[in-house]
Every structure is written in C-alpha cells, then in structure tokens.
Amino acid sequence: MSATESSSIFTLSHNSNLQDILAANAKWASQMNNIQPTLFPDHNAKGQSPHTLFIGCSDSRYNENCLGVLPGEVFTWKNVANICHSEDLTLKATLEFAIICLKVNKVIICGHTDCGGIKTCLTNQREALPKVNCSHLYKYLDDIDTMYHEESQNLIHLKTQREKSHYLSHCNVKRQFNRIIENPTVQTAVQNGELQVYGLLYNVEDGLLQTVSTYTKVTPK
C-alpha cells in the first residue's frame, strides 16, 4: 500500500480485492447495528416503504445519503448526468414502481456541480469519444450537448469554465425536472395531492443542496 493510499479517507481503492470489500461490508453492517440495532431485523428485513424517489447522476461523490437518511427510506435511480428522457422505459417504469407500487410521496431529481458529462460537452471533448471506443457515451450525451448549444448565448456572459459548468448543471436539473413533471403517473399523483416533485442541485464542494424547481398541487385560495 502506498503512502497516498494509507492516508486516504476512503474505505476502498483501486487496489482493493474481494476480501477487502467483504471486510468493509462487515464493518459497515456492525457499525449500523450499533447505531440502529433494529434497522436490519425489524425494518429492512420486513420489506421497504420508502418515502422518496431519488433520481440523480451516477457520479461517485453524491447519492441519497446527502439527505441524511438510513437504508430503507429512499428508492434510487441514477445514471450518467441524471438524464430523464420522457420516453425512456426505465424512467417510466421507475416512476410507476415508486409512485404506484411503493407509494412514495416525494420525487427528487438531483443534479450536481462539476458534472463530468456536462464538462465533456462544455469543453468540446465529446467529439473525441468515438475515437477512444466510447461511441455509446457519445450518443448518450447528445441531450447534454443539445442543452449546451441552446444555452450558448447565456454562457457568453460567464467568465470561467467553472461558472459555465455550474450554470449548465442548474439548467440540466430544470431540463430533466420539466420532463418528469410531464409524466402522466407523476401528474396524476400530484393533482391528487399524493406527490411533490423537487429539483435540487448538489454542490460537491460543500455537500449542500440548492432548490432549483418545485411542483406541487396548487391549493385554491
């Protein structure tokens, strides 16, 4: 183990093997049992009843844990750049399962700053992807690249790449949020007062969430 690895704050590394993974899991399970002795036997073992569907990017730096939750509270779906195409079968099935079957009453679409998918398009590196055997990733990022070009006039006023990346991350949450709230399953649940939808942006620099958009039933005055 190198000096860098020995001083790392992380549990596992590229050099970790199966034994390391199982040992880390055993330690985690023991710690969870010490913190919440009833979590596994009395709650998780008897099924799930999550209150929230969390849709996010597959980036390793954040997940539903940013909500401060325990296993069993949040149903999760993540993909590269948290893209939600309206006709995507996985998206539609996930929304149906979470809302109709699991009865969640909150859907969160959560993007994040410093997104690799966004930066790839912002820095025009997407065009090189097919040359390094990433032709599927090239095609997949078409939605982000389209957004990048749609926002080109607004990006002109931002000075740094960091500012532009942050702005596009914010735009991407709005973009995917607007698709989610057009989903029939979502619309029905919201209009019945059974669901709220939140668009959030996670900042990788401080771990905090920022509200981007909300969709709830409008109550007549």
Swiss-Prot record:
Entry GO CC: cytoplasm; mitochondrial intermembrane space; nucleus
Subcellular compartments: Cytoplasm; Nucleus; Mitochondrion intermembrane space
GO BP terms, alphabetized: carbon utilization; cellular response to carbon dioxide; cellular response to oxidative stress
Catalyses which reaction(s): hydrogencarbonate + H(+) = CO2 + H2O
Keyword Mitochondrion: yes
Any one GO MF annotation of this record: carbonate dehydratase activity
UniProt KW keywords: Cytoplasm, Lyase, Metal-binding, Mitochondrion, Nucleus, Zinc
Amino-acid positions noted as binding Zn(2+) in the UniProt annotation, renumbered to this chain: 57, 59, 112, 115
Gene3D superfamilies associated with the record: Carbonic anhydrase
Entry-linked CDD domains: beta_CA_cladeA
Induction remark: Transcription and activity down-regulated at elevated CO(2) concentrations.
Family statement: Belongs to the beta-class carbonic anhydrase family.
Cited function: Catalyzes the reversible hydration of CO(2) to H(2)CO(3). The main role may be to provide inorganic carbon for the bicarbonate-dependent carboxylation reactions catalyzed by pyruvate carboxylase, acetyl-CoA carboxylase and carbamoyl-phosphate synthetase. Involved in protection against oxidative damage. Encodes a substrate for the non-classical protein export pathway for proteins that lack a cleavable signal sequence.
Name by which UniProt lists this protein: Carbonic anhydrase
